[in-house]
C-alpha cells in the first residue's frame, strides 16, 4: 500500500502533484485545477472510507485504486463523499463475470439461470465491477461503468431502492419523472426503428427508469454534448442534481486548446 493515496490532510498543491498520473485520463482532461483539487479531495476521502477488493487473482496497484476512486468521486465532486456512504466495499473482477439469477416469466413461473454481468449495485450492499470495463471508462465515449453503478447508489438514497429519482426536492419530482420517461420512450422508439445496434444511445436506458437514470448519467459525464442535444430537459435536471455542467466544462477546455495549441513535434537533422 502506498500511503500517499490515503493522506487527505496534505496541502492541496502537494496532493495534486501526487495524483497527477492518476488524473491523466481523457475523461478528466476538461477539469481545471480547482476542479481537480476538489475531485482529488473527494477521491481521497473515498479511499479512506471504502475497501477495494480484487477477485480472481486481480492485482490492484495504487494507480489503479487512485483512478477508480477518481471515477467514483466525479459524480459527487460537488455533492461530497457522504453521498456515496451507502456502501463500504467494491468487489472487482478482472473481466465481466457470471452470476446465477432467478427470473419470472409471463405465467408467473420462476426459472433459474446464469448471465454475464459487467457490474452490480446491491441494495444495502457492495458495488461489483470488473477491471476490463473500468479501463474502458477512462475516455469520453459515453460509456462509464463506475458512474453507472454510482448513479444507482445515489438513486437508492431516495427510499432505499432505485426508481430513477435520486434525492431531489418534492416539487421537482413530477417533471423529473416526466422528462425521464420521455427519454425512455424516445430511446425505445429509436430502437424499434433502427434496432439495438443502430441506436445512438445504449438501449439499456429504455429498460426502466432506474437504468435510464444510470445510463444517461454516463452520457452526462462522458458524452455531455450527446445528452444535451438529445434530451436537453434531462441534461438540465442532471446539472441541478449533480451541481455540475460537464458540457460547459468540455467547451471551456476545447476553447483553451484552440487558443493554446500544443507545440508541434520538431525533428532536427544533421
UniProtKB/Swiss-Prot annotation:
Q: Which GO terms describe its molecular function?
A: aminopeptidase activity; metallopeptidase activity; zinc ion binding
Gene Ontology biological process terms, A to Z: proteolysis
Q: Which domain of life is it from?
A: Bacteria
Q: Which residues are listed for Zn(2+) binding in this entry? A: 111, 148, 152, 211
Q: Does the keyword Cell wall biogenesis/degradation apply?
A: no
Determine if Isomerase is one of this entry's keywords: no
Could you tell me which InterPro entries the record lists for this protein?
MetalloPept_cat_dom_sf, MtfA_enterob, MtfA_fam, MtfA_N
Task: Report the function annotation for this chain.
Answer: Involved in the modulation of the activity of the glucose-phosphotransferase system (glucose-PTS). Interacts with the transcriptional repressor Mlc, preventing its interaction with DNA and leading to the modulation of expression of genes regulated by Mlc, including ptsG, which encodes the PTS system glucose-specific EIICB component.
NCBIfam families assigned to the protein according to its UniProt record, in alphabetical order: PRK15410.1
- Entry-linked PANTHER family: MTFA PEPTIDASE (PTHR30164), PROTEIN MTFA (PTHR30164:SF2)
Protein known as: Mlc titration factor A
What gene does this protein come from? mtfA
